Amino acid sequence: MQYPKVLLLGEPFNDYSGMGITLTNLFHDWPKENIAVASYNLDVSLCEKIRPCAQYVPLGGASFSQSFATRRSYRRKGLKSTLRACLGRLYSKLGLSDLRHIPVTSSLLDCIESFCPDIILSALGSLDRIRFCEEVLQYAPDSKLALYVVDDWPNTKFNGRFCQWWWRKKYDVAYKRILAKADVCMSICQYMSDAYMVQYGVQFYPFHNPVEVAKWDAIEKMRKYEEGVFSVLYVGKINRDTQQPLKDLCDAVTELNRNGEKVIFDVYSPNVKHNIDLSKYKGCNIFSQVPNAEIPKLMKSYDALFLTLGFSEISRKYVRLSMPTKLTEYLVSGIPILLYCPEEIALSKYVSEYGAAVVCNQPDKRVLQQSLLNMIHSDEYNDCIVSRARDLSLRHDVQIVRERFRKTLSSVV
């Protein structure tokens, strides 16, 4: 079985980010000696634990703009923090991060020379990373280029900037230039592949995060709460795409509890302290994120799983072709899904096409409340949803997806 030597450029293997989890799952079977990583924010000890590699090359820490974002999240009120926040927003609006030059370090050149990658795989993500990838290719003339895109950043990264029209043109020209150099392109879902074929005339092979169906089936359901209580779980980040939808469900749960229902909504998130306060909602709780390995057991202890993406114009544009990493885990969990998101985005289309979730496409708390009420009082309805979701999850089984991924990369060597 052929496993080409792959240098992963720009993204690390990890167990906490969508990209890191997906890449870890896709490359799970790769021999250690055939995979190397050159990445930002590289945690070698974590890689060694979950996805060992032949070589590791750190490319640096967080960018200037990312450091501003981090400081804003944890800032104290005061003149200095206010000025820092204003400067950070100005930095983002000017798009200064895209003007950076990312150097090709001697350690990276040594890796390319000694490892001799058959393929350099990059997710890119910005203009400066496109230029960096192009420069790296000059030092690896015999390596093939594989691109993997999971968000529609080529069409949205510049939203909100000054001279947006100028940045749009810059991104379009640069992305088309790197696409012309690519030997194989991959996307996060078929909807993105179809859209990019129309826009760029390039075939993108879809690869979503695979799931170990057998592993999930072996986990028994153990209720967290007593009989008679309908429990709902959300696991994930709290950001501009999810904050308002989470509050909408909290309002719906609070109203149902006031009307005599017994409903609990639990949120597990890595950023619980800084983005949302659930103390005013009845039956709603927020907890720190649990280790990734404990999530399957946690999911199977609830009556419903809440999955959402935002309804704002900014969110709609950014996530229109995206597919959440955790979707496959939701599908295989055996727990009915309550999906709350715009109708036109890829996630809604995919799940609705197969009837794999209770779908609420209107940003209306009353409609969301009624959808939840239907789930509370109809086991037959929930069982039907679960059955369809499981059938859909089989398409994403690790054995199928990993082999297709291996063949796709091997085909260009």
Predicted regions and their residues:
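A conserved catalytic-core segment of Leloir-type glycosyltransferases
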Residues: V44-H101
